[in-house]
């Protein structure tokens, strides 16, 4: 008896789904065995990440790195999508791609095997994908299965709900919330306005949740033309973050500067002298961690949505091949990472909430 065409197609689809799940499970098991038994990384034997642009598959020249760089601290921008429109954003919504969850986990395993101790999830807005569930599953995986000392997130905070803390707060060490001003009109000018929602009020609510669910609280501020004269001393002291990261507004060609950019950040720029004046005004804030353009540009290991390292040394974000294709050791050669500057800017610090000994 012949099987009807529709039924045959359905059976084939179910078989393909089961086969795909089996392959993902075997890939995960193989990565775990490599970590446990110390097997060498097959590197180029890995399949190409689905959805990665074809142009990134071209062969790069080997820069001849004498000693492999250890990816101790990695910033994974798994999405470029965002619900805010900050005028100076330097990681804009140029694609809508997000890796399948199991592929992202496979890449995180490779990073762990290569020596990663801290992962920071960013975007875009990381809580946009699947209402924060995608992010939560990665956070739990990194803390529970990879046993990373530090798992952190950078978010604008607008989409975070208390339920997320209840489900995933135990696995998160640090939550960094972007706040560039305590004047709501300035936030609107910058692009952080969201209708009737008040960014500053939301910040205070998130601070309480972090305390309630024992997550270290951090604030990130980008100092620009619209907030450079603001006095934030009392607000920051009242919120009492473990760190207040203060960045100087930075231009990145192709992101917030140049013909193919989605933002025009030139009007937000400030001089080095203006940035120093802001720092002097806030020198008595003990948690202040300043980062000028010089310190910031080459001192971060950045992975994009395809798990490619982004090299910012030329003022652009030039991608390596994906670690899912060639492995971490090969891809990181093209990251442009300045390890000395990473250490000089204080990139290595007490980043596990177990070691922070906070008074919750």
Curated annotation (Swiss-Prot):
Induction: By interferon type I, type II and LPS. Interferon alpha induction is rapid and transient, peaks 4-6 hours after stimulation and returns to basal levels 24 hours after stimulation. Interferon gamma elicits a more prolonged response where expression remains elevated 48 hours after stimulation. Induced by infection with Vesicular stomatitis virus and pseudorabies virus, presumably through type I interferon pathway. Gene3D superfamilies: Aldolase class I. There is a cross-link at residue 205 (Glycyl lysine isopeptide (Lys-Gly) (interchain with G-Cter in ubiquitin)). It is found in: Endoplasmic reticulum membrane; Golgi apparatus; Endoplasmic reticulum; Lipid droplet. Residues 68-288 form the Radical SAM core domain. Its main location: endoplasmic reticulum. GO terms for biological process: CD4-positive, alpha-beta T cell activation; CD4-positive, alpha-beta T cell differentiation; defense response to virus; innate immune response; negative regulation of protein secretion; negative regulation of viral genome replication; ossification; positive regulation of immune response. Residues 49-63 have a biased composition (Basic and acidic residues). Acetylated by HAT1. HAT1-mediated acetylation of Lys-196 in turn recruits UBE4A that stimulates RSAD2 polyubiquitination leading to proteasomal degradation. IRAK1 and TRAF6 synergistically activate RSAD2 increasing its activity with CTP as substrate about 10-fold. GO terms for molecular function: 4 iron, 4 sulfur cluster binding; lyase activity; metal ion binding. Residues 44-71 are annotated as: Disordered. It is a peripheral membrane protein. In neonatal rat tibia, specifically localized in cells of the periosteum, in osteoblasts lining endosteal and peristeal bone surfaces, to articular surfaces of cartilage and in perichondral cells but not in chondrocytes (at protein level). Expressed predominantly in bone marrow and spleen. The modification N6-acetyllysine is found at residue 196. InterPro entries: Aldolase_TIM (IPR013785), Elp3/MiaA/NifB-like_rSAM (IPR006638), RSAD2 (IPR026372), RSAD2/Viperin_antiviral (IPR051196), rSAM (IPR007197). Belongs to the radical SAM superfamily. RSAD2 family. The N-terminal region (1-41) is necessary for its localization to the endoplasmic reticulum membrane and lipid droplet. Homodimer. Interacts with IRAK1 and TRAF6. Interacts with FPPS. Interacts with HADHB. Interacts (via C-terminus) with VAPA/VAP33 (via C-terminus). Interferon-inducible antiviral protein which plays a major role in the cell antiviral state induced by type I and type II interferon. Catalyzes the conversion of cytidine triphosphate (CTP) to 3'-deoxy-3',4'-didehydro-CTP (ddhCTP) via a SAM-dependent radical mechanism. In turn, ddhCTP acts as a chain terminator for the RNA-dependent RNA polymerases from multiple viruses and directly inhibits viral replication. Therefore, inhibits a wide range of DNA and RNA viruses. This is S-adenosylmethionine-dependent nucleotide dehydratase RSAD2. The gene is Rsad2.
């Amino acid at each position: 008896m012949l099987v009807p065409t529709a039924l045959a197609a359905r059976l084939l689809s179910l078989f393909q789904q089961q086969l795909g799940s089996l392959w993902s499970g075997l890939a995960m098991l193989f990565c775990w065995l490599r970590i446990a038994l110390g097997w060498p990384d097959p590197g180029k034997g890995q399949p190409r990440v689905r959805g990665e642009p074809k142009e990134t598959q071209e062969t790069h020249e080997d820069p001849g790195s004498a000693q492999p760089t250890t990816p101790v601290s990695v910033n994974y921008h798994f999405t470029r999508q965002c619900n805010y429109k900050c005028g100076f954003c330097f990681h804009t919504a140029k694609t809508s791609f997000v890796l399948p969850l199991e592929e992202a986990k496979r890449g995180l395993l490779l990073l762990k095997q290569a020596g990663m101790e801290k992962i920071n999830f960013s975007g875009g807005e990381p809580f946009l994908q699947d209402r924060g569930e995608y992010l939560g599953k990665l956070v739990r995986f990194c803390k529970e299965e990879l046993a990373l000392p530090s798992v952190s997130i950078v978010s604008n905070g607008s989409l975070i709900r208390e339920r997320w803390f209840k489900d995933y707060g135990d696995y998160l060490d640090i939550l960094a919330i972007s706040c560039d001003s305590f004047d709501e009109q300035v936030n609107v000018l910058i692009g952080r306005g969201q209708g009737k929602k008040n960014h500053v009020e939301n910040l205070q609510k998130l601070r309480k949740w972090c305390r309630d669910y024992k997550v270290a609280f951090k604030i990130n501020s980008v100092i620009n033309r619209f907030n450079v004269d603001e006095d934030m001393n009392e607000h920051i002291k009242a919120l009492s973050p473990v760190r207040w990261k203060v960045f100087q507004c930075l231009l990145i060609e192709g992101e917030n500067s140049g013909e193919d950019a989605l933002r025009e950040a030139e009007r937000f720029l400030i001089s080095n002298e203006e940035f120093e004046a802001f720092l002097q005004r806030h020198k008595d804030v003990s948690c202040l961690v300043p980062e000028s353009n010089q310190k910031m540009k080459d001192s971060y290991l950045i992975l994009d949505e395809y798990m490619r390292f982004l090299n910012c040394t030329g003022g652009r974000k030039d991608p390596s091949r994906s670690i899912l294709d060639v492995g971490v050791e090969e891809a990181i050669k093209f990251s442009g990472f300045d390890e000395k500057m990473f250490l000089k800017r204080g990139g290595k610090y007490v980043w596990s909430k177990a070691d922070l000994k906070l008074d919750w």
